[in-house]
Curated annotation (Swiss-Prot):
Keywords: ATP-binding, Cytoplasm, DNA damage, DNA recombination, DNA repair, DNA-binding, Hydrolase, Nucleotide-binding. Mg(2+) binds at T72. GO terms for biological process: DNA recombination; DNA repair. Residues 1-187 are annotated as: Large ATPase domain (RuvB-L). GO terms for cellular component: cytoplasm; Holliday junction resolvase complex. Homohexamer. Forms an RuvA(8)-RuvB(12)-Holliday junction (HJ) complex. HJ DNA is sandwiched between 2 RuvA tetramers; dsDNA enters through RuvA and exits via RuvB. An RuvB hexamer assembles on each DNA strand where it exits the tetramer. Each RuvB hexamer is contacted by two RuvA subunits (via domain III) on 2 adjacent RuvB subunits; this complex drives branch migration. In the full resolvosome a probable DNA-RuvA(4)-RuvB(12)-RuvC(2) complex forms which resolves the HJ. The keyword Transferase does not apply. It is an enzyme of class 3 (hydrolase). This is Holliday junction branch migration complex subunit RuvB. One of its GO terms (molecular function) is four-way junction DNA binding.
Length: 359
């Protein structure tokens, strides 16, 4: 019998509807339901409670941190807990000041405006946002050249919630206009176990504690990845007719190229570049990106923070350098001279398996 609590696999189950409902159900609806980020939750609770007691809109909020830690969920919780409508957009969708003006002019009093990837807005839109955040008005330019005139447009009071993975890319005048900045951190293992157990209950999936711990150890400290891996484990248990035990979890995650440290195919490609192509480094970000065939921004914002966090890579003024732990994990011997070719230190199958036999 499978760990899944439903009938025969051939039964007509509306999987698409169930999956859509699952996506929405996974998001916590209140700060009390939100797992992890204890300090940020306490700060937000104080901010929202004070605003409610004074019958005013909450201050503008900036949520900063790596992808998948709950920035969008927290924005939705801010709207839910303050009982205000929520409008969602993203920085890449605002490439002209006119795009932002259209969004701002449509806001109703007290509305929460969530801008994901706010650091990717056009500079002209950022400059328009300064006045909107401070005085709830914008200036619309009409005409061109010497005959151009500025027409002020009053806006309804609103709260801006911005999310960014690159807070350093925001200009100081914009950062300074946020009343509160929350810095989200990677999750601890025990917090991830709570996230996985909650999601498993919603999936009606019976899963052993050892299996939960295994997923928590491979999900890069990120709830979004934890939930994604859990769904793959669910699929594996369903297809193979097994319980969601430790062996099933390991088999499923190995099938999807997630190693015991949580490294995926892109992580290993980056490490392969540093270790085998550049002798452990140092190597610059752009050079590394070209060798891997990936965008430099993706490596810097998605891959590198995790590799640095688990101690496989260090950043130096000259570039990225592999640590002794990286050489050990991949079964390679560090070269005597920086930049020299790497050699396998153990059985050839170890390094070959980790690197896809591309040594």
């Amino acid at each position: 019998m499978s760990g899944l609590e439903h009938g025969d696999a051939s039964s007509p189950v509306p999987e698409s509807d169930a999956e859509l409902a699952f996506e929405g159900a996974l998001r916590p609806r209140s700060l009390s339901e939100f797992v992890g980020q204890v300090k940020v939750r306490g700060q937000l609770e104080l901010l929202l409670t004070a605003a409610a007691m004074q019958n005013r809109s909450p201050d503008h909020i900036l949520l900063a941190g790596p992808p998948g830690l709950g920035k969008t969920t927290l924005a939705m919780i801010v709207a839910e807990e303050s009982r205000r409508p929520l409008r969602l957009t993203s920085g890449p969708a605002i490439q002209h000041a006119g795009d932002l003006a259209a969004v701002l002019s449509a806001l109703v009093p007290g509305e929460i405006l969530f801008v994901d990837e706010i650091h990717r807005m056009a500079r002209s839109a950022e400059e328009m946002l300064y006045l909107a955040m401070e005085d709830y008005r914008i200036d619309i330019m009409v005409g061109k050249g010497a005959g151009a005139t500025s027409i002020p447009l009053e806006l309804s009071p609103f709260t801006l919630v911005g999310a960014t993975t690159r807070s350093g890319m925001l200009p100081s005048p914009l950062r300074d206009r946020f009343g509160f900045t929350a810095h989200l951190e990677f999750y601890e293992t025990h917090e991830l176990e709570q996230v996985i157990e909650r999601a498993a209950r919603m999936l009606h999936l019976e899963i052993e504690h050892e299996a939960v711990a295994e997923i928590a150890g491979r999900c890069r400290g990120t709830p979004r990845i934890a939930n994604r891996l859990l769904r793959r484990v669910r699929d594996y248990a369903l297809v193979h007719g097994t319980e969601a035990g430790l062996e099933s979890v390991r088999a499923a995650l190995d099938l999807y190229d997630v190693d015991p440290l949580g490294l995926d195919r892109l992580d290993r490609a980056v490490m392969r570049g540093i270790l085998t192509r550049f002798g452990g480094g140092p190597v610059g970000l752009n050079t590394l990106a070209v060798s891997v065939g990936e965008e430099a921004e993706t490596i810097e914002s998605v891959v590198e923070p995790f590799l640095v966090r688990i101690g496989l890579v260090t950043r130096t003024p000259r570039g990225r350098v592999a640590t002794p732990a990286a050489w050990e994990h991949f079964g390679l011997e560090a070269p005597a001279a920086p930049g020299a070719p790497a050699r396998a230190s153990g059985p050839a199958s170890v390094a070959g398996a980790l690197f896809g036999d591309e040594l």
